[in-house]
Amino acid sequence: MTVKTFRGSPALSEFRLTQLQQKCQQYQLPITSVYAEYLHFVEQKTSLVEDEIVKLQALLHYGSMFSELKPAGYCLIVTPRVGTISSWSSKATDIAHNCGLSKVNRIERGIAYYFNIERDLTEAELATLKDLLHDRMLETVLNHETEAALLFTQQEPKALTTIDILNGGRQALERANIALGLALADDEMDYLVESFTALKRNPQDVELYMFAQANSEHCRHKIFNADWIIDGKKQDKSLFKMIKNTFEQTPDFVLSAYKDNAAVMEGSKVGRWFPDPDGQYRVHQEDAHILMKVETHNHPTAISPFPGAATGSGGEIRDEGATGRGAKPKAGLTGFSVSNLVIPNFEQPWENPLSKPNRIASALDIMIDAPLGSAAFNNEFGRPALLGYFRTYEEKVNSFAGKEVRGYHKPIMLAGGIGNIRGEQVQKGEIPIGAKLIVLGGAAMNIGLGGGAASSMDSGKSKEDLDFASVQRENPEMERRCQEVIDRCWQLGEENPILFIHDVGAGGLSNAMPELVHDGRRGGKFDLRSILCDEKGMSPLEIWCNESQERYVLAVAPENLELFTALCERERAPFAVIGEATQAEHLILHDSHFDNNPIDLPMNVLLGKTPKMTREVLSKTVENQSLKTEGIQLKEAFHRVLRLPVVAEKTFLITIGDRSVTGMVARDQMVGPWQIPVSDVAVTTASLDSYHGEAMAMGERSPVALLNFSASARLAVAEAITNIAGTHIGEMKRIKLSANWMSAAGHTGEDAGLYEAVKAVGEELCPALGLTIPVGKDSMSMKTTWIDNGEQKSVTAPLSLVISAFARVEDVRKTLTPQLRTDKGLSSLLLIDLGEGHNRLGATALAQVYKQLGDKPADVVKVQRLKDFYNAMQTLVAEDKLLAYHDRSDGGLITTLAEMAFAGHCGVEVDISALGDNDLAVLFNEELGAVIQVADSQLESVREVLKAHNLLGITHQLGTVTADDRFEISRGSHKLFSEKRSELRSIWAELTYQMQRLRDNPECAEQEFEAKKNPDDKGLSAFLTYDVNEDITAPFINKGVKPTIAILREQGVNSHYEMAAAFDRAGFNAIDVHMSDLMIGRRNLAEFNAMVACGGFSYGDVLGAGGGWAKSILFNPKLHEQFSQFFINPNTLTLGVCNGCQMISNLAEIIPGTENWPHFVRNKSERFEARVSLVKINEVDSVWFAGMAGSHMPIAVSHGEGQVKFKSVEQFAGLKAQGIIAAQYIDNNGSPTELYPANPNGSAEGITAITNLDGRVAIMMPHPERVFRAVSNSWHPENWTEDGAWMRLFRNARMVF
């Protein structure tokens, strides 16, 4: 094979080049200018002929939006790490093959950097420059393009290694333990020596590696299952038994706990929406039970933040999909705890930057890259991210031996979510003897080795090269393909071919396959060389144990293999049958290449008889001083608190994540017309036709554990309850919790503290409240150690419990938000003080910003009061008695009130006289409680409800809401604090601005920051020129044959369900059509009246968003003809939305009347943008927008490449002259705009929807299908009932037929 190089488009925008040059200057490198462009390296099986080269060059021409320069100067080429295959490569190669380029073996991409230099670089300068250009965990720097052949080097398969314990004894195993990074404990090594001596043979490296992964703390939770002796006294229960006690006390509504990849609870009976085997989407009335899971991915995120967090989210999504016999992930949550950010030029008074080991990323780098990784995976998979938390902590505090640093050098990266599952699919099936054992998903690669064992070690205990080996690689588009297969399977009901399914996570197949057959009470016989592999030189250990992502293991009965194969082929999801289930509980892995058995073990050696841990520990107490508040000024204190990340505005973490996909999001983080990120709870509808739903909320108060372990745990549970209380759930037993425990096991005092905290929750608080914890996770190695200039250093995380609460929702429309209302007449603000006046300041945000800890933290004062509070809120919510609700948490009462005022774009006047004598304690304590806004006309009835629940005595009337721009706090007649709300809002927004300035286009960051300062911003609004509640298709109901529409999707598309639902509601028969159906002739576009190309990430947006999809049509003669005929047929309609818009714009050459259409390129911000944007509908001659001209209304936006790009000024002028610009982004005053974020992508004159000349073909970047129901709009006017404003677009299409 030979490698050919093709130049690509410029890789970096001007501001990215400027940033790079500034970094070079910062390190005093002699560089005067820099330019970067993509290089494509194509490995050919045989030489391409001229027309194939032309086709390939067209394929590799994409995304050219920056100025192209002639490459010149000193060159360095950054490529994916040699020996790995990037996900970009996998998808680009797929596109080439689907375009008929069968001679292409693989395509890889690099970036060539060209530097003008004043003199030759020294070796040290060159090393610095390379560090600036690449991530050593993921990338390689080449000196010349001829070295690109290294990217395609294939080696001969490596052989097994045998560890000679029969002759070398335990010492041989100890050497292997260190060399392979197995993290085996002493008793485990004794066990292995004993086991293999009894088998009379030496172990192979793969067997030891498999054992280490399968029995790591990460996978087997040995500490939570251990026996405990504390202060010399044997404890009755393990940690896990105390957690299980919550289920034993309150099993109500739980369908599955502790035995599967996720827990399941009862959901609502609704009309679930999916296609039947004939391809037509239909409603299926059935229970949509709720599954829940929350994972952590801390170690990989510390080592390489983007892929670490991405694969964290991906692994949790797989856990959900692999529940029962297959389930559907629905909505996600994310959380991060890191040390202090220390943002350049934004350093804060409480931040004293400490050093860190080189092998881990800084807190700032983690919070720039990790949220992008997590969001990117969720976005591309098609799961909305609706909830999260973000905490920073790093401080020297008192310890049992002087001072020590507590913080999150080893971060917490939390990924979780909910999904739905059919009742009959909740329990896994039996695995019959002879069942086919299958790996579904991508090929094995030599990455992510040892993740389970590495995650189980304190950061610093493993070798850096082992950290390097445990980095993983994400390919969410592949996971989407696999999920589509799983969906097709469970949608078959009783005919579901999946009997048993697990995801492949830590330990790779070495953990997943033994777990699969063990759980099915079987053994397995496997063929190593049947496993799909992208790297032929891998050893048996590397093939069996690597953690290549996006894979599942399944058991399928032999008679159903043909059906399963057909489903995979349609979705283009790779799979391999690698073995069969056996009656004997024995594991055999045969290697046909070397004709040996790398594994030949009884299952009980691997999983059955491993030693049980006993932990003998001492409890410790630390003396702490009370908070010193002398000299602290209220104004300065509040400004500091508003800048503390746990309190500050977190828009930079939210708008990078899709929050509208599925069309079932009823409450995301952004609240009200001003889209302020202060929601307490995330809410989804259970289906596309129901008001039943699901809710998620979180609770986390980890700094409190530095003062009181059990109080921290109780507060986490209680805060999750006060967060979720503002939606309509019913009895508290309906709420189920996930508990994620992070601890530095073995650190003095932490083990006993962990036991105390688990007992407080599992044995006491949750049983008293009737709460169940059916799922959770532990991470027991939260300590970082390193040597700095010969000095031993360490940073230890506080005991951290993150509680995620999940519940069925009776009516999603009743969900309250913190938005204060000024349009509801006179109203009052009430504080329900569950802290009962204790006003403790220990471990608060106030303490943190003054580099203190304090001594007494908040706690649950009375458990019954918490229950009464929840029940009272449920009554008030159900009866629509409240206008706004917000719990008191980080930052205290003053923050609660400020966030409510920000959301309402209004002022408040409150008097704190009744709350205590100490102003700082009253305003900044973080005791449990909530502020409610009540219309004065409802005040008496609300008081009656509070009285009935014994809360009136702890309820205090604070003051009123005002329509002006003042935030005022008084004590009687004395004004304590008075400031413009808009100025406080600006301070609160500084963190987001600073992070966006570093991460995104600084010009966009500046524009958004300025927009937030505007006290006169009108917020979102809607003006419709038609009646939103009129169904213009009503005369067609039940009359005649419905027109059919092809709901067209390609691999990676994710918005087809809601699109089909919108067209079905408008009166179409919606048919699921995959591009593979058209390619092989299962379907033909001639069958359909209309076609819609749906949104998502076809081919992961590789080769330009929508570009690969379009080129697979243009370069396929059969598809080219089929699409051409459809477009010229005057009796058809076509719609393209988001990715479908991008794709159809690339088909302009075969669509009549599109000669002036633009292409769509990367957003000006260079960031995926998920926003609610205002658009104006123009007067165009198009059936799609009939009767809508002059309207302006909100719409969901979710894209990374939505900026229009014209070939010339003349083309742009031609488009305007033709009058086919259907919609434009407008600002909150109604004027078309190019300012960010009202215009989320920077398109000229706000262009966002276009038609062809005769109006039959329309393309648009925003998502009307996600907001066709009023309830799925983040904000909408109250006179909208069931239908959203965009339902008219779909009904307009129906009027044609």
Swiss-Prot record:
UniProt-annotated location(s): Cytoplasm
Domain (Glutamine amidotransferase type-1) ranges: 1045-1297
Keyword terms: ATP-binding, Cytoplasm, Glutamine amidotransferase, Ligase, Magnesium, Metal-binding, Nucleotide-binding, Purine biosynthesis
Keyword Repeat included in the entry's annotation: no
Binding locations of Mg(2+): D680, E719, N723, D887
Transmembrane segments: none
Cross-referenced PANTHER family: PHOSPHORIBOSYLFORMYLGLYCINAMIDINE SYNTHASE (PTHR10099:SF1)
Name of the protein in question: Phosphoribosylformylglycinamidine synthase
Species the sequence originates in: Haemophilus influenzae (strain 86-028NP)
Lineage: Bacteria, Pseudomonadati, Pseudomonadota, Gammaproteobacteria, Pasteurellales
